[in-house]
From Swiss-Prot:
Family that this chain belongs to: Belongs to the cation diffusion facilitator (CDF) transporter (TC 2.A.4) family. SLC30A subfamily.
Location in the cell: Mitochondrion membrane
Transmembrane feature ranges: 132-152, 158-178, 209-229, 256-276, 316-336
Protein name per Swiss-Prot or TrEMBL: Mitochondrial metal transporter 2
Top-level taxon: Eukaryota
Gene Ontology annotations for the cellular component aspect, listed alphabetically: membrane; mitochondrial membrane; mitochondrion
Lineage: Eukaryota, Fungi, Dikarya, Ascomycota, Saccharomycotina
Transit peptide, from-to: 1-56
Entry keyword set: Ion transport, Iron, Iron storage, Iron transport, Membrane, Mitochondrion, Transit peptide, Transmembrane, Transmembrane helix, Transport
Protein's gene: MMT2
A Gene Ontology BP annotation from the UniProt entry: intracellular iron ion homeostasis
Stored SUPFAM superfamilies: Cation efflux protein transmembrane domain-like
Amino acid sequence: MLRISIDSIKQFGSFVPGYNNTSYHAAGRAIRTSSLYSTMISANPRRCLHSSKLLNKEGQEEGYNEQLISKMSSQNGSNSRQNESEGKKEGKASSVKSLLQHTHSHSHTHMHDNPLLSLNVQQIKKNPGVRITWIGLASNVGMAVGKFVGGITFHSQALLADSVHALSDLVSDFLTLFSVQYASRKPTSEYPYGYGKVETVGSLAVSTILAMAGISIGWSSLCAIVGPVIPHAILESMAGLIGETHSHSQSLTQQATNVNAVWIAAGSILVKEWVFQATKKVAIQTNSNVLMANAWHHRVDSLTSLVALVAITSSYFFNIQSLDNLGGLVVSGLIIKTGGQGILSSLKELVDQSIPPTDPRYLEIESVIKDSIGSLKTDLDLKQSLHVRDLTILASGPNLRATTTLEVPVLHSGQEVGIRFLENAISTIREDLRMKVPNVGKVDVEFVDVTSDSKGDLEHSHDTKSTNHTHTHSDSADTHTHKH
């Protein structure tokens, strides 16, 4: 609630002609009413209509009070023009007004929403990553129910095991949905680089689940293959360390399966392959690692359904149950490889490993910077254009952070380049990067004299207080240039 101290109001009216206690109470009541309504608007716009109806009942009385305050302000303005000493008292009134504005803005800053998972139709339509994730989640629910019912109806243990795996995919989908939606929030003063690392953590979790699923499928297939050779007691003791997942494969060899279960497996392959292609397309467009990991999770689901299809057809036509187990080993190897690559990539990003110069993203940003600084050569009488000495790019989820060091040549006249030119250079580079590479966030630029020999000289100049080093920070808010 917005409040103004009694002393501040007294100071406001102490120098106004015609001020009395009645005017003091009326002014205080008007300020409290208008401040309350202003605070309610900033805190909850949806309740403004209801609040305005309540305040309208006192509109006539408070309208008189506002006219009184306006009259006192106009009288005070005329007195200040007649006497310079009254200008000091006018400053007191403006200080009260600034106090009012400051208090309102402080109250407004604490009313930000904190959306995590949202079923808002507008949010789903606006964010393609959220939309495709919800589609994948719905497909997982449908496939899990369909495989479970089909496994019971057609006596297919492969479909039953695949339905349990589909249910575990729901955890992956919720992690992806949370990561994509949370990472899309704008940077704040507490998190100036944004929330991109949240998506990296989500990618690590999804990749870990993917790798564990591959280990589970591989262990199940391995137990079924070596079961006739290795004693059953040894397999049971080893399964206790990993999980009793081999029972699905063993039970598959003991039960005959209805061939109609093939239709459910084939339908699952088609649906999951379509979701994989759609999710992969969005992941490439948005540069999202967690979406890419989830896309490969959908591909794994289609492959496991393919294994179930092969198991059903082979057991029905050829009575060869071992094909299911061999196919399971192949699929598990692919799953473990994909999950391991995702885990390694996420860990590298979490520890801020720079993007290699051969990466297409690096080459694109480097090309944009070179084009930008090439256009600056004609602005001044430079012997040569600026030169990119060093470029470092860090990934933060779907966003990129760039830090570059530029060599500044001298003028033909031998004069040094001014600060204004450097600020213009960083502004041009920043605008070009954001126009041509939309996922670039924060940009840091350092300028060094062309006479500097190496990057080590640049790092050493921070300690030796060199006079030929200019350091510039650039982000979405402002640009700061420091010359030493």
